[in-house]
Amino acid sequence: MSLLNTPLHELDPDVAAAVDAELDRQQSTLEMIASENFAPVAVMEAQGSVLTNKYAEGYPGRRYYGGCEHVDVVEQIAIDRVKALFGAEHANVQPHSGAQANAAAMFALLKPGDTIMGLNLAHGGHLTHGMKINFSGKLYNVVPYHVGDDGQVDMAEVERLAKETKPKLIVAGWSAYPRQLDFAAFRKVADEVGAYLMVDMAHFAGLVAAGLHPNPVPHAHVVTTTTHKTLGGPRGGVILSTAELAKKINSAVFPGQQGGPLEHVVAAKAVAFKVAASEDFKERQGRTLEGARILAERLVRDDAKAAGVSVLTGGTDVHLVLVDLRDSELDGQQAEDRLHEVGITVNRNAVPNDPRPPMVTSGLRIGTPALATRGFTAEDFAEVADVIAEALKPSYDAEALKARVKTLADKHPLYPGLNK
């Protein structure tokens, strides 16, 4: 048999075994990392299609390679769907990731040395919003803003810093923040100082698509997002912008940042955008929010407080909960490991003014999108929230909690058709 037509399990059993093991891990544990989700089988089929073979530098109708007539159709479908989904004038669906979408947007709007403002990483921002060792911190003069004592973005500080430093770009967005941002207020500040407003909605784009979170598109000059978090599609990025900025954005992506787009991923994005426009998706996003609120409410009860556990801002408006462990006997790493032990995957996360190192931290970021995609109901979320609360106590029964997790995982089978 030609190697071209040899199945993975025959051609490379080592890689196949690792893939099978990962499938088993996803099926048998509860995924609660806020930035992770489960892509529909149709999305994975598109991403694993023959489109992976095609080079297509350029844009639909304007390629530097022949034979692009079919990938042109696919990419235009993706563009049209995401524009309709968010009400955008322009969309570029080629960025390979959210970080590259942010980089391209900044390249389109800025020159090296220009001043930008973004939420401080330790207060919930993202690497690409101005971290010193990231491209954004190296190429631009970064003025970070912060959360106040209540754990929410201090808009008075944003306005003051903007007037003092006159940034060319203000970034509104986050990677670990449990509340909604006031996009109109950000735009007002941006207009007052002559800055562009860029919103990074990577985490909450699915909620926006479902009409359960304010849409930043009417307020921002540019909006970036990933396609795999709450949107639940393939791993990739998208840039939305005004029509006025379309040419700058496209040029910054290609040839500015990337060469050939990954058209198999673009196809998967197109499928994900169709899913995101469905009633099923909207219902799922509702359960995502409900699950996060149930979790937050469980972790502010007296028994959790007695264990030194608290919830930043006292609750959540989005798909994640930030747990503060500064008064607990556990640090973030230990808490992550303990939940992993019982079958729940989360990630340690810094809290504002965290006294511990970044690889240890004093907090956890816990999200509900993947479990909502899996079919979890309010009753299921109440059960998993109780398991988490019990696991974070000084004394816990690991075996009993593992059994409860297994019951939940078995109740909601994941990708049963993929089992060999």
From Swiss-Prot:
UniProt superkingdom: Bacteria
Pathway noted in the entry: One-carbon metabolism; tetrahydrofolate interconversion; Amino-acid biosynthesis; glycine biosynthesis; glycine from L-serine: step 1/1
Protein name: Serine hydroxymethyltransferase
Chain positions of site Plays an important role in substrate specificity: 228
Entry EC number(s): 2.1.2.1
Major localization listed first in the record, in broad terms: cytoplasm
A family per Pfam: SHMT
Residues the record lists as N6-(pyridoxal phosphate)lysine modifications: 229
Gene Ontology CC, one term: cytosol
Biological process according to GO: glycine biosynthetic process from serine; tetrahydrofolate interconversion; tetrahydrofolate metabolic process
Cofactor annotation: pyridoxal 5'-phosphate
Record flagged with keyword Transferase: yes
Classification via NCBIfam families: PRK00011.1 (NF000586)
Family assignment from sequence similarity: Belongs to the SHMT family.
Function in brief: Catalyzes the reversible interconversion of serine and glycine with tetrahydrofolate (THF) serving as the one-carbon carrier. This reaction serves as the major source of one-carbon groups required for the biosynthesis of purines, thymidylate, methionine, and other important biomolecules. Also exhibits THF-independent aldolase activity toward beta-hydroxyamino acids, producing glycine and aldehydes, via a retro-aldol mechanism.
Biological source species: Streptomyces coelicolor (strain ATCC BAA-471 / A3(2) / M145)
GO molecular function: glycine hydroxymethyltransferase activity; pyridoxal phosphate binding
InterPro entries documented for this protein: PyrdxlP-dep_Trfase, PyrdxlP-dep_Trfase_major, PyrdxlP-dep_Trfase_small, Ser_HO-MeTrfase, Ser_HO-MeTrfase-like, Ser_HO-MeTrfase_PLP_BS, SHMT-like_dom
